[in-house]
UniProtKB/Swiss-Prot annotation:
Family, as annotated: Belongs to the bacterial solute-binding protein 3 family.
Gene3D superfamilies: Periplasmic binding protein-like II
Keyword line: Amino-acid transport, Periplasm, Signal, Transport
Function field: Part of a binding-protein-dependent transport system for glutamate, glutamine, aspartate and asparagine.
Name recorded for this polypeptide: Glutamate/glutamine/aspartate/asparagine-binding protein BztA
GO cellular component: a single term: outer membrane-bounded periplasmic space
One of the GO biological process terms: amino acid transport
Length: 338
């Protein structure tokens, strides 16, 4: 490990120790607002709309947590963060939770003293090129210029992939997705590399989307999910189970529209615990027993959130793939509410 990396990790750990000395739950309640670290602008995942209101797949997680804790999904302040600033912002207490398409890795989990509490999107890194480049495989990119975001796993995966395939490239460093889209569109790089979901989002926003192809290779595993500070385990539990309430709701056929009807009629013990009709799940994490119910009502279940923001009917057009429910061949399921 390089000394700079070591001292950087130590500094982050020190920030976390200070920030976690007080309860995040107490801070959020006292403030009356959840502060959520977010992407500066990734269409479908987290981006302000024409009215400046943040919308997207990751935004829905922030709304679910705010609804669970504060009773109102709109009581969220979104702080746009780059790949380089996001973890420091969380560690220092600038944000309460980070939901910014961030990959769960060994070093981030251990050295940075941060906790990834769930995976809300299973992804992998890919490459995007203009059809005019005349390549159909990432293994044909030898000597190419590649737009890549600094401070990310993308940067490291890119180096590994080219080294493993005995190829060379010239990186064109970018700070965020918006800059990557701009430089790629301007021809500053031959290819843009990031998570495949991010590529689909970027392509959808470009005027010449029909002329852009996402190459078939997926060169990494990118489990993306919400992150909290290490040491405040109760807050981690709140974020984790607020998210899993959305996943469980989809499994049991509970939607934003039918939740009240299901709650009034169900005899399924798991659903009754999930919706706070039996047991004391909420009390175990410092909330009331309707916390999961409010989380679901914020934006709907996991499937509703996926389809509304990034699904097949949207301009992003992502298939569920690995993010389908376990009953549908995917990896997505919630631990038992018991």
């Amino acid at each position: 490990m390089k000394k700079s990396a070591f001292f950087g990790s130590v500094a982050l750990a020190a920030l976390v120790a200070g920030a976690a000395s007080a309860s995040t739950l107490d801070d959020v309640k006292a403030r009356g607002q959840l502060i959520c670290g977010s992407n500066p602008g990734l269409t479908g995942f987290a981006a302000p709309d024409a009215n400046g209101v943040y919308q997207g797949f990751d935004v829905a997680v922030c709304k679910a947590v705010a609804a669970a804790v504060l009773g109102d999904p709109m009581k969220v302040k979104y702080v746009p963060l780059t790949g380089e600033t996001r973890f420091t912002a969380l560690a220092s207490g600038e944000v309460d939770v980070l939901v910014r398409n961030s990959t769960w890795t060994f070093s981030r989990d251990t050295e940075l003293a941060l906790d990834f509490v769930a995976v809300n999107y299973y992804d992998g890194q890919g490459f995007m090129v203009n059809k005019s480049l005349g390549v159909s495989s990432a293994k044909e990119l030898d000597g190419a210029t590649i737009c890549v975001q600094t401070g990310t796993t993308t940067e490291m995966n890119l180096a590994d992939f080219f080294k493993a395939n005995n190829m060379t490239y010239t990186p064109v460093n970018i700070a965020d997705d918006a800059e990557g889209q701009q430089k790629f569109a301007a021809g500053a790089c031959d290819s843009y590399t990031t998570d495949a979901s991010g590529l689909a989002s970027s392509r959808a926003t470009l005027p010449n989307a029909a002329d852009i192809v996402i190459l078939p290779e997926i060169i990494s595993k990118e489990p993306l999910g919400p992150v909290v500070r290490h040491g405040d385990n109760n807050w981690g539990d709140i974020v984790r189970w607020s998210f899993y309430a959305l996943v469980a709701a989809e499994e049991y056929g509970i939607t934003k529209a039918n939740l009240e009807e299901v709650a009034a009629s169900t005899q399924n013990p798991e659903i009754r615990r999930l919706l706070g009709l039996e047991g004391d799940m909420g009390k175990k994490i410092g909330l009331d027993n309707d916390f999961a119910k409010r989380a679901i009502l914020a934006s709907g279940n996991y499937g509703e959130v996926f389809e509304a923001n990034i699904g097949a009917s949207t301009s992003i057009g992502l298939a569920r793939g690995l993010n389908a429910q376990w009953t549908q061949g995917g990896l997505m399921y919630a631990p038992p509410f018991r």
